Swiss-Prot record:
Species annotation: Haemophilus influenzae (strain 86-028NP)
Positions annotated to bind ATP: 41-48
Primary localization class, coarse: membrane
GO-annotated biological processes: phosphate ion transmembrane transport
SUPFAM superfamilies: P-loop containing nucleoside triphosphate hydrolases
Protein topology in the membrane: Peripheral membrane protein
Alphabetized PANTHER family for the sequence: ABC TRANSPORTER I FAMILY MEMBER 17, PHOSPHATE IMPORT ATP-BINDING PROTEIN PSTB
Signal peptide span: none
This protein's name: Phosphate import ATP-binding protein PstB
Gene name per UniProt: pstB
Function field: Part of the ABC transporter complex PstSACB involved in phosphate import. Responsible for energy coupling to the transport system.
Amino acid sequence: MISLQETKIAVQNLNFYYEDFHALKNINLRIAKNKVTAFIGPSGCGKSTLLRSFNRMFELYPNQKATGEINLDGENLLTTKMDISLIRAKVGMVFQKPTPFPMSIYDNIAFGVRLFEKLSKEKMNERVEWALTKAALWNEVKDKLHKSGDSLSGGQQQRLCIARGIAIKPSVLLLDEPCSALDPISTMKIEELITELKQDYTVVIVTHNMQQATRCSDYTAFMYLGELVEFGQTQQIFDRPKIQRTEDYIRGKMG
């Protein structure tokens, strides 16, 4: 369905283990460039495990292992000699709960940039404004950049985390249930932002909210018990699923 030319991430025969527990089983999947792909499925199905394998977050924890291939622009991230910090710069991540750093709004954005680039003060100011503008936050914080990131509302904090992620100019942005802790208005702003971000980034989102998947995503992957059950364009998955288990899940017949 997605050609090689359209592919940003190609997953081949991916298996993942938590010690002896086989959490992901022979996953094969292509993630399209400059599109939003949603992972859906019941709790414990493996969708967050799959998402976090894309930038090797699992290496922060003991006794976790991935085998197979996760090719980003043709390079296998599981075997590459690329520095792990560079991988996580290329494949940025925003977590379920907003996690601003204990520093100013300005430094929340500038911190990661300083790790990879030496910018003049003027250029750094431009980058901070650019990232906050991209995250639809600049107009709300431009007069209080010196204030702590913790001083913002939950929805603003999550947009700050998105701005922090895109400030280092990744090619992929991973969002792990980014709206689950937010109120409906903040959720709407994040969803609008996700739709806009695909102009510049490949976006992958894990969500329990199937309505959110239909609103935000171009492609949807349904997972169950560590297996990829069905993958396709979002409208097709929700309107005309080909697999009975997919239909049962989206119609609420299974948890």
